[in-house]
A protein has these predicted regions:
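Intrinsically disordered, metal-sensing/regulatory segments
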Residues: 1-218
């Protein structure tokens, strides 16, 4: 419910606040989410991942970092709150697909937790990951809803698309519940490492980014 509500909250912020207040809120939400993600990464998630004594943890984290970099090539950086609006533009389905893949991947470790796969991990680690996703989803939903309302979609259809996006992380959780990493030739350390690498890329980009007109160029 929390995963769904965080996205709905982002949509409500866009539709209720005026442009000035919305811009101010986005900046504050981004700064908080970036700082919160970095804090839980270095205080809980990364130390506990390395305690698992996996031999390739660093490689998994780097893979997640690079996967996020590739996804942002198609999404334009909306994962860290950046949206480039052109009034009346067509619905950017490539961006939506990229953002959906990101959300599904980050939900998988939560599902694995509930199956008991990581019962040996501290409960605080799971809670940190959950709240990290929650606080990350709000500014992403704000940016996505802002973009949707600038397209040729009606307001009702924009809410439908946002609702579809809201279902993506729970879909990842369901996948993690139904399929163990070993069933697809992976392990939990690999999946969590990839997710943490993605979070590391997003949080550092939020913290160190200074240009409001930032975009990724390849």
């Amino acid at each position: 419910i929390g995963l769904l509500f965080s996205v709905v909250l982002g949509g409500l912020i866009v539709t209720t606040l005026n442009a000035s207040n919305k811009s101010h809120f986005i900046k504050l939400a981004l700064a908080f989410s970036g700082g919160f993600l970095l804090a839980i990464l270095f205080e809980h998630l990364l130390p506990e991942l390395y305690e698992s004594k996996g031999t390739s943890v660093g490689l998994y984290i780097l893979s997640g970092f690079l996967i996020q970099l590739l996804l942002e090539y198609f999404s334009g950086g909306i994962e860290h709150g950046h949206v480039h609006v052109h009034k009346g533009q067509a619905m950017p389905w490539t961006l939506f697909l990229s953002l959906s893949i990101h959300s599904i991947i980050e939900g998988i470790p939560l599902g694995n937790h509930y199956t008991g796969i990581i019962a040996h991990h501290a409960h605080e680690s799971h809670e940190s990951l959950f709240w990290g996703i929650i606080f990350h989803q709000v500014p992403v939903a704000i940016a996505l809803m802002t973009l949707l309302l600038s397209t040729s979609l009606s307001k009702a259809k924009a809410w439908i698309v946002l609702g579809l996006f809201a279902c993506m992380t729970p879909l990842g959780v369901c996948f993690g519940l139904a399929v163990t990493p070993e069933q697809i030739g992976l392990n939990f350390q690999m999946i969590l490492g990839v997710v943490l690498g993605m979070f590391l890329h997003i949080s550092t980009t939020i913290i160190f980014e200074t240009s409001e007109n930032h975009k990724f160029n390849f």
